[in-house]
Each structure stands twice: as C-alpha cells, then as structure tokens.
C-alpha cells in the first residue's frame, strides 16, 4: 500500500516536469536571493525557498541553491549536499561550516567568504531534510515522530523531481550527491531511488553520475566494532573497557544489554575526558560541555551503540554562530524562510527527530554493491581524527564488500605534504584525509576541495608533491 502511494506521488511529480509552464520561471525568480544580510558582494546567483513534497500532510522541504562562482556556471554540474544526524541541517553544517561560499562570524552579524568553497567547481544545492529539520516543516505533527530512512529517501526524490520543474535549466545536467555522517544512509538510499526511477526513461531528467560520502555511517555491526577499536588504538579508553565492550556488546542486535550499556557509559563518562569526539586532537570549545549536558549526548537510545553515538552536535561553537544568524528575522525574509510562522526557533539539529527516528537500515553494503555494479562513481572518504564515525569503522565495513583492488593503497599529496591515503577498488574509491575530523571540509578545507575536484574529474588523488 505504501509503495503504491509512493508511485502515485512520483507520477504526480513527473507530470509537473513533463508539462512545464511559464510559472516555473516565475517561481524560480520568486526564490531568488537578492542579498543576504551582512553578505559580501558576489557575482553568483542564489535561490532559496520551499518545495512541497506531500500535499495532504503539508510537508515542505527548504533548499538553498548557491550557483557556481565560475565564469560559466551553466557548464558546471549540480551537487546536492545532505547532512546527517539524523535530523541535522545541511544549511547549518554543509553550507555554513564546510563547503558553502560563506562563513558566519562569531556574533552572527556578518558573513565572510570561504576561500575553499565547492561552488568554484559546482552548483551547490543544500537541502534541509526530512521535514522538521531547520526551516523544513510539516503541518502533520505525527510526521515528526515517525520519520525514518525510507520516507526521507522518498521525500528527497520527490523534492528533486519537483525542484527540477522549477529549475528546468538543471534537467539533464550532470548530477552528484554528497554528504557525511548519517548521510551515509541518506546519500546511497537516495542514489538507489534515483537509479530505480531512471530505469523507466531513456533520457532521465536526473542525470545521476555518482556520489561521495564522508565519515559515513555504513553498517551497524562493523561500524560499531571499528569505532570501539579506534577508541582503544588511540588510547582514549582502557584495555579493560575495550575488552568489556567487546565481551558484553552484541552489535548484531537492535537493543543493547544493560552490561553493554554500562561498559560503554563507563568508558565515555570516566575515560574519554572532555575531548571533542568529532576531532580528538583539537581544543574543545567552552560551549561544548554545555551542549553535551543540554542535548542528552549520553541518553540511552532505543537502538544500538551506533545510534547512541550519533546524537547531534558537531562543533558546538560554529553551530551556535549559525543559530544566531538563521534565527534573525531579516535573514529569514531574505531567504524566503519560515513563511508559515513556525512557532519554534531554527536549530542546527532537531532533538525530536533524533530521539524518535523509526526505520534505520542496519547496513548500506547491499546498496553499495548494487550501485558500484551500475557504473556510478562512488567515493567514500574519512577524516582520520573523528572518533564518532572513525576511519576504522568505514574500513571494517567496506572490507566486507570484497571488491577487487584496482590501485593499491598509496599516500596522496597536497602542498608537499601527505594529504591522506587512498585505495581504488572496482566501482568504489576510498580515501582518508589526514588531520581532519568528522566534518572534513571544516577541518581540512583545502584537502577536501582537492579531493572533490579529483572526484568530479574521475581521476585518482595526486601522487606527487
């Protein structure tokens, strides 16, 4: 029944793209951002607004498009960026801290340019998804308590189809998806939806070429084993805690036992210390401890250890700058946001969605196998100082794909220094970024940009100085 309803929604969305009207140009122009408050002068165009993905429930997703700053943006691909959580904003993180053209100052009063913005090479589309994240909303309150992987992927596909109707110049354009963390679910799940959808057309409007994901949640069992191993090998936890967690935690089941819960809680509360778990070698922010206490970082979730680790919060300092800026009424007017007068404040992550997330696939490995065989370009990258979804977790998970190696492990270089390490498999490339935390473009922006350019070009990462 649910599948039939989804197919019906796709047909409705498809009809709106098959018979474009003059209203598309009017809708597009209505979404144009003339200038953001405190924004430096730029030559590229920006648009933002809402796309309704479910009329009966009143679910609408908010987007922000920053076109390429290159002299010929019409020749550049379109990149959709998704952040994870689940329940965290791509505008708060991807756009404002990582790959977007602007950074927010500490007071939330002004913007300044990001020297390593990815819109030098692509048109960037940031989507706040699912409904309930950031400015995205639903008129059906129960939607906030039964969100999950499947509906998020469905809504994101419907968004894309309808958005392309509003922006027909992007139909058939080379299209890529990127993201990080729990977007390790969102990105491949959406890629599969698009791949399946495109099979019905000889020339599909969504010209999906590939995707890349950083510090990606991939497989509950292997990710969890790899994470605990990272904690121990990086001297964050004791031998005793490491052995206790491996002894008492069964990472193949949905619910953790009390013994497992106690072992993990002891390690995190008594051995970790006050470190930034998303970047273990960088200083913590004063606000970090406050964030930990107020968001329930250590609350017991209903799922696995993995879910317990994913309660929100990247860098709490930069996150607070975004919350100051995007709650400003003049910013919301400029972005055509909060047009329905949402009663709650814009936040970087939704606690409600995080705590009530319903369906979460245990593994992405079957999707990776399918899409790797389909010819899509797939890159997985890991910042190597992240202890939340660490490099060992990703390597443990990817090793179970058993893909043939095309290019053996080697160091790649930037500015006469090792930028990380990489190995190329048949259908998939894996790369590390040296010195980067959970949000790779935040901690190592230049290396992240070089990685992105190599991905777009379909070339291996540079071997030379």
From Swiss-Prot:
Regulation: Completely inhibited by phenylmethylsulfonyl fluoride (PMSF) and partially by leupeptin.
Post-translational modification: N-glycosylated.
CC annotations in GO: extracellular space
Primary residence: secreted
Expression (tissue specificity): Expressed in shoots, leaves, cauline leaves, siliques and flowers. Expressed a low levels in roots and stems.
Catalytic residues (positions): 181, 386, 438
Temperature curve summary: Optimum temperature is 50 degrees Celsius.
Cited function: Active serine carboxypeptidase with broad substrate preference, including basic and hydrophilic groups. Processes a protein involved in an early event in the brassinosteroid signaling pathway.
Protein name per UniProt: Serine carboxypeptidase 24
Species: Arabidopsis thaliana
Gene for this chain: SCPL24
